[in-house]
Amino acid sequence: VKAVHQAYLASGCNAIKTNTFGANRLTMGEETCRKVIEAGWNIAREAAGDAFVFADLGPVPMTDAKRALEEYRFSVDLFLELGATNFLFETLSSFSCIGEIARYIREKQPEAYIIISFASQPDGFTRSGQLASHLIHQAEANPAVDAVGLNCVSGARHMISLVEQLGTVEKPLSVMPNAGYPTVLGGRTIYEGDPQYFAGQMERLHAMGVGILGGCCGTTPKHLAATVEALGGSAPKEIPVVQPEQKKPQPERNRFWETLEQPGKKPIAVELDPPESGD
């Protein structure tokens, strides 16, 4: 994990987040959750050097808002004890209890920097059926929140459309797209988004006023290095038109088809019927 942090920092990133997205007592129990948060913070802190470290908290599997708030408080208290001052609540589908936990952090650590980020489909709606733009403005109106944004689910190109739908956002805006969309190849889920294309879209987002840029699912150090290079420390004067690189699909070997194409060979199909009550 430390090596992964260092790879992203070497690509030019000036902030990393702890490897604690799914850490909560509902999914792993209190003892394991505590160990994961402590290890996640310490590893990120060791790797960061002068870079910022954000305590990363994903959505809590909600039974109800009260229980979710208790889970967030448990994690937040641990991070605060460890010395965290930057917090990222990401991949959210609603604002339920998030405003309250943001105020809780602010009371405990007045110097905290808190980012609230929602996950939206390309059509503008979150998994809970709420408009991401409404959630963004709801979060922005909370005095305890420092920055708002979007992450995950959508690729960089669709993030541009989502940002266009937001209207005026007074607080700093964060966008962390996926590296395109996932495909399953050979039983593995992969993202084939080209780093240069990704960087071009990120450049457009920066020109639109997005002040905090990063990557979510499928983004590698190459994607972020290309983004850092494309930005060059300032927003472009014109929004560039970037065309994605056309990739040729790689043929997959099919032994059944190969047998059909060979003269004199016949495929043999066998049906296996398991015995009754067999396991």
Task: Give the positions of each predicted feature.
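Domain-level signal for soluble alpha/beta catalytic cores
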Residues: V1-D279
